[in-house]
Amino acid sequence: MFKKLSLKGSSNTNNQIKSSLQRNIKNSILAQYPKLKDIEEDVFPKKVPIVQVKCQNHINLVLINNEVLFFNEREGPYYPTLRFLHKYPNILPHVQVDKGAIKFVLQGANIMCRGLTSPGAKMEVDLPVDAIVAVMAEGKDHASAIGVMKMSTNDIRTINNDIGINNIHYLGDSLYMSPNLE
């Protein structure tokens, strides 16, 4: 999604939004990620406005204290950024790819089923289609990518062919390389 996105000069509008829309965004994010309820004050401090930046390709960035924390495409679900996920790693379920898939994940490729079922890979939680996941790499501590399940974990294990996870945001893409918009 962010392979070719240039954030410098690409934003159409950079507005502090109305308080009702701020509440809607905050409530939508909290409903989507219930584990954030415990750290709500850290993520959404009082008296700090939420800024929404609209970029090319219908991508909206959610900024708090000039730091990009979440993004979405059109009116779709909100995804956390990798920097935010590294601060709060338990807000998303984890899947792990094997060592052979790491290079391709870091280049923005979608994750194939075989990279999730081979030795070294892990899928410990049963996940449905369209679940947002943190993609971990074998032998690494932090998430390498954020993706959306294109098959359930049971289907990935049984079919073991085709794309299992769509890679949405990965280490080294343009969003990761520019965490602040100034």
UniProtKB/Swiss-Prot annotation:
It is found in: Cytoplasm. Residues 92-172 form the PUA domain. One of its GO terms (biological process) is formation of translation preinitiation complex. One of its GO terms (cellular component) is cytoplasm. GO terms for molecular function: RNA binding. Its main location: cytoplasm. It comes from the Eukaryota. Keywords: Cell cycle, Cytoplasm, Transcription, Transcription regulation. Transmembrane segments: none annotated. PROSITE patterns: PUA. May play a role in cell cycle regulation. May play a role as translation enhancer by binding to the cap complex of the 5'-terminus of mRNAs. The PUA RNA-binding domain is critical for cap binding, but not sufficient for translation enhancer function. MCT1 N-terminal region is required to enhance translation possibly through interaction with other proteins. Belongs to the MCTS1 family. NCBIfam families: unchar_dom_2 (TIGR00451). This is Malignant T-cell-amplified sequence 1 homolog. It comes from Dictyostelium discoideum.
